[in-house]
From Swiss-Prot:
Gene3D superfamilies: Cytochrome P450. The gene is CYP51A1. GO terms for biological process: cholesterol biosynthetic process; steroid biosynthetic process. Sterol 14alpha-demethylase that plays a critical role in the cholesterol biosynthesis pathway, being cholesterol the major sterol component in mammalian membranes as well as a precursor for bile acid and steroid hormone synthesis. Ubiquitinated by MARCHF6, leading to proteasomal degradation. Belongs to the cytochrome P450 family. Pathway: Steroid biosynthesis; zymosterol biosynthesis; zymosterol from lanosterol: step 1/6. This is Lanosterol 14-alpha demethylase.
Amino acid sequence: MAAAAGMMLLGLLQAGGSVLGQAMEKVTGGNLLSMLLIACAFTLSLVYLFRLAAGHLVQLPAGAKSPPYIFSPIPFLGHAIAFGKSPVEFLENAYEKYGPVFSFTMVGKTFTYLLGSDAAALLFNSKNEDLNAEDVYSRLTTPVFGKGVAYDVPNPVFLEQKKMLKSGLNIAHFKQHVSIIEKETKEYFQSWGESGEKNVFEALSELIILTASHCLHGKEIRSQLNEKVAQLYADLDGGFSHAAWLLPGWLPLPSFRRRDRAHREIKNIFYKAIQKRRQSQEKIDDILQTLLDATYKDGRPLTDDEVAGMLIGLLLAGQHTSSTTSAWMGFFLARDKTLQEKCYLEQKTVCGENLPPLTYDQLKDLNLLDRCIKETLRLRPPIMIMMRMARTPQTVAGYTIPPGHQVCVSPTVNQRLKDSWVERLDFNPDRYLQDNPASGEKFAYVPFGAGRHRCIGENFAYVQIKTIWSTMLRLYEFDLIDGYFPTVNYTTMIHTPENPVIRYKRRSK
């Protein structure tokens, strides 16, 4: 098989040699250095493809059956263009043709998808030493969060850090957060006036940062969140891009430089707040204090750099989920005015006719609003793909996935498979009144992941979104503009609504 791969390489060299020579003459004008650089790039690309092909062939154990492979005639890029244009359609078509497990190549990497609850169980039940997260996510998150936290550390250390953060995301804190978020929301929407048309995704993204910073970072850091710092967060958030995923971090791209500068400046803000809190010795019951008091199993306390990195990670990891989900839910409610009015009336039924300030216990009883969030997360999960790198051979559905494959689950596809969901494309919050809306399948609904990989910020996200939308429903009625319901923007890593402008009108008292 390796010999066959070698013959393939020779064929490519022979076929490409004359074409390359002609192209080089035209592009470089005969400049020797330019011609050498292009020739080297061409040769290295072919060697890379040879190693990829040979590796794909020899890494399977004897007698093992590899997943169905979707061939592409396009070298290196593979299916990147088709997938990037319409990833959900691509995966659903592949599922219909090849079944729940299949592989394909994009940008020189082989991806194996596990669609449907049974196949997805492999990823969600896996151990990190078999299907590894750091190998996939570190290059994306480390420049944003910083060294020494999250996917930059061995998994046991990361698990300890997650446990520290989770201890601060508790009901006692959530009860404090509700009034904070309600106050921030009312203040933010004062500038909207009586009626108008606004980019609701942009507005909610700003509001999510304000509320999350206040709740998760403490009053010292929130007090410094002005327009300049908000732009730093935006630049840092810009580090979550396709370019950052695919290209080396040392490249001098403008977005990389903005990301790195923002990281340094935000860290400095955090360092000052951390030092001020340490020196004051004032014990404030918030997550910043939780981290300052926390220790690893060996008794070592967190450094200021670790605390700052974990606070950045906590904010930005949840910011996408909450802002995207909040915006999409606004459009679903604007499209169904009857449902929107039911959500408003639920506020009066649960909280009181005069709509007093919200409490955590009231939030828990807003069941219809809760189901609307759940259904929004089903049809528009912010994270379309969850990935791991196979470090050991993995067997699923009779196939063996070799080491080196990026193993993927798509919540977007799993949560709308016709094999699992009745009226799968309809926005129907009442489906969750049933005990088993997805035929009892364990991994059919996974917007926050599952098992040991489940997101620790899920409960905070629900508190945040329910409080914001409770306040918004009390303030305004929302409508689509000329019936326009946004399409999905697949060019970003978080799948946001295209042209997310909504019409609003203040409710009469």
